[in-house]
Amino acid sequence: MTDDFAPDGQLAKAIPGFKPREPQRQMAVAVTQAIEKGQPLVVEAGTGTGKTYAYLAPALRAKKKVIISTGSKALQDQLYSRDLPTVSKALKYTGNVALLKGRSNYLCLERLEQQALAGGDLPVQILSDVILLRSWSNQTVDGDISTCVSVAEDSQAWPLVTSTNDNCLGSDCPMYKDCFVVKARKKAMDADVVVVNHHLFLADMVVKESGFGELIPEADVMIFDEAHQLPDIASQYFGQSLSSRQLLDLAKDITIAYRTELKDTQQLQKCADRLAQSAQDFRLQLGEPGYRGNLRELLANPQIQRAFLLLDDTLELCYDVAKLSLGRSALLDAAFERATLYRTRLKRLKEINQPGYSYWYECTSRHFTLALTPLSVADKFKELMAQKPGSWIFTSATLSVNDDLHHFTSRLGIEQAESLLLPSPFDYSRQALLCVLRNLPQTNQPGSARQLAAMLRPIIEANNGRCFMLCTSHAMMRDLAEQFRATMTLPVLLQGETSKGQLLQQFVSAGNALLVATSSFWEGVDVRGDTLSLVIIDKLPFTSPDDPLLKARMEDCRLRGGDPFDEVQLPDAVITLKQGVGRLIRDADDRGVLVICDNRLVMRPYGATFLASLPPAPRTRDIARAVRFLAIPSSR
């Protein structure tokens, strides 16, 4: 490999401010060798290694077909619009590059047209968004909905004007030649480097979604960034699920077919109404939102059983009625195919005694999902890798537990892979301090949020905000935010009150804010400099013991003679904590304090595993020392 990473290499010459880093060069060498030998490679690269450039440069130099997959759409967009162009330009790369997302990320012109025709039946706000989207549809080049600023990202119009694998009419669609998904796929087929995300990669490999399936067999190199998310995402795709959103979409499409093309078939409207009603009734039976529970236990309840049977019957009715009008409307024909698919899925979900699977359900305020997930995806993922010879490269800042990658590789069935553990080049002994508070209030006791907020207030105020408070539950997040707002004058931002992107923008522009958040801010958030110099974590992030997926994995581990705590719960929590901690120091000049409000870190034997997996920062139990550390001005 020409040494692109040397002080006088291509990257240093072409990229302003590029500083050579030894761990980055080591990773680039390992990636180059893995590509040349066509063998798997697993790399944990600590924050600040510069892992993106370390895999991009060798991948572009290899002149092979490359798929790069990310855990989040945010990183996918950043790679495609920022990192890839920068490295391509530096290396004078002349190949074609494409971005490909799942089809629900693109505007569907046919569904937009159908909604505009059904306009009078839509609520006013949705109708006004549909009108805005019609005007946007004439301006957009790629139809990527993340680039539309005129309609809010949580607008209820989006599911109506985007397609899913289930409701797409495919080549029968009157808008097929202008279809944004088809254009994006064609571009990806012709490209040398394609940027996708894990959801799309796995959906394609498992479901063989038409079109994209032809793209992957040709790839010589598969690179997974944020690879720590792969095992959980893979388990979703190797299982099956059915959601109320899918059923309500089906009912809507049957209604549109009746109102536009099949006005003589009133039965269609009746069966669509009954399906929508039974889906909503079933959601009401499930109770509180935000809960993930055991489907086997749920279906033992006679009341739920009755609602489930009713759902099954109305789906059956839609299938029978749609069958009578086959061949008269492309929209209804597609709806019939979905009804067939959903009947099969519902049947699988009813057979709750299949061993080797976890059966679970989840509900939000308006919707529910019923799902079955395999307990282990190792064999299936191993099979997948065997079918696709080439280099499989997995990287993330958080793959190891106590300097061991086995937890990650065993979950994906990765064998005989080269592995590399690269520590962060940051000087944590100078840049950071870890504080585990003394005299913490008893968790889950009434008033614990009030006491904790009172303990934390002095350090947050001494730091003039500039703080992330990361919580392990929504309830704690809301309670703490309420306490902070009642007792502090600093701006307190709360996750969920606006979109993630806007919250981050508000946090950065305020310059003295406290952001109280939960899971989605634990990873993939990059705030550099003095804007963020304090990260507080309310407790060690063990997954709730009631979570059916966790329970099932623990049971599977027990049956194999393992220790569920040591092999499942502890490693999962360590990886999550490492992600949260990684929010603090993002640059060589950053300084900050990490506060963990959980005595178990120092009182329980397993605390040592957590500490051994964290960056080597000095530790204290004295909050006054943490306040003094924050008072020292940074070297910026």
UniProtKB/Swiss-Prot annotation:
Report the GO molecular function annotations: 5'-3' DNA helicase activity; ATP binding; ATP hydrolysis activity; DNA binding; DNA helicase activity; helicase activity; iron-sulfur cluster binding; metal ion binding
Q: Which domain of life is it from?
A: Bacteria
Task: Name the cofactor(s) required for activity, per the record.
Answer: [4Fe-4S] cluster; Mg(2+)
Q: Which InterPro entries match?
A: ATP-dep_Helicase_C (IPR006555), DEAD/DEAH_box_helicase_dom (IPR011545), DinG/Rad3-like (IPR045028), Helic_SF1/SF2_ATP-bd_DinG/Rad3 (IPR014013), Helicase_ATP-bd (IPR014001), P-loop_NTPase (IPR027417), RAD3-like_helicase_DEAD (IPR010614)
Enzyme Commission identifier(s): 5.6.2.3
Assembly behavior: Interacts with the DNA polymerase III subunit Chi (holC), probably as a 1:1 complex.
Can you say what this protein is called?
Answer: ATP-dependent DNA helicase YoaA
Give the species: Escherichia coli (strain K12)
